[in-house]
From Swiss-Prot:
Gene3D superfamilies listed in its UniProt record: Vaccinia Virus protein VP39 (3.40.50.150)
Pfam families: SAM_MT (PF04445)
GO MF term set: rRNA (guanine-N2-)-methyltransferase activity
Protein name as annotated: Ribosomal RNA small subunit methyltransferase J
Gene name as annotated: rsmJ
InterPro entries cross-referenced by the UniProt entry: 16SrRNA_methylTrfase_J, SAM-dependent_MTases_sf
Cellular localization per UniProt: Cytoplasm
An annotated GO cellular component: cytoplasm
Keyword field: Cytoplasm, Methyltransferase, rRNA processing, S-adenosyl-L-methionine, Transferase
SUPFAM superfamilies the record matches: S-adenosyl-L-methionine-dependent methyltransferases
Amino acid sequence: MNVYDLAVISHIENITDIEFEYILSSQDDKYLYVDNNILKLHYKDKELFIDFNSSEILNRINPSTKKCSVVQAVEGRSKDKLNILDTTAGLGRDTFTLAARGHRLVSLEKDCYIFVLLADTLNRARQIPNLKDIANQIELINIDANEYINTASISFDCIYIDPMFPQRNKSAKVKQGMQVLHDIAFNDDESNSNLLKNIIISKKTKKAVVKRPINADFLYGKKPTSQLKGKTNRFDVYSL
């Protein structure tokens, strides 16, 4: 397949202003393509695309569904609509879930491949009546989180960090999308600790929330103000 296919170039140019030459790769094991007007990433023997209209996401944002842990951790006792910075957009599930609660999101994704997949699903969501208003709550930016923290002039009610957990195995229980995301966009704990450090120093928020494996060390060695614990992970909440 020619990764410089005009359909791919046209599709990317229609959903984002990023330069397509920066994205398209001549690598045989990693390339973008369009299938039924959906932008997809082929990576080795796997396929990745993002769909905010999936049954999983729709169930997650259903008002009758119990608030998930990320919502509880970010909102706390607040009843207000918040301005939130998601420093690690990834597959966008937490961003979209928080936006569905009426919050405004600036969502950062440094990997250009994942970024355009997110831009594509946001563009599709804006064409769906019941998702349009949610998608319009999200500003997606292709940038490294540390760079954004160091240069942005605005502040937020909450800054959220969801570092990918180290993969212990490649079992079938690990979803294919997470396997691909981990392989191409993983940051180690040192990088994530530096991010939390920069957030604290920047004074751009009074609250930071970090998602961690249940038994993992604290990022930046800093004990949180409070925690919300689940079976396999926890949310460390910092009042700054």
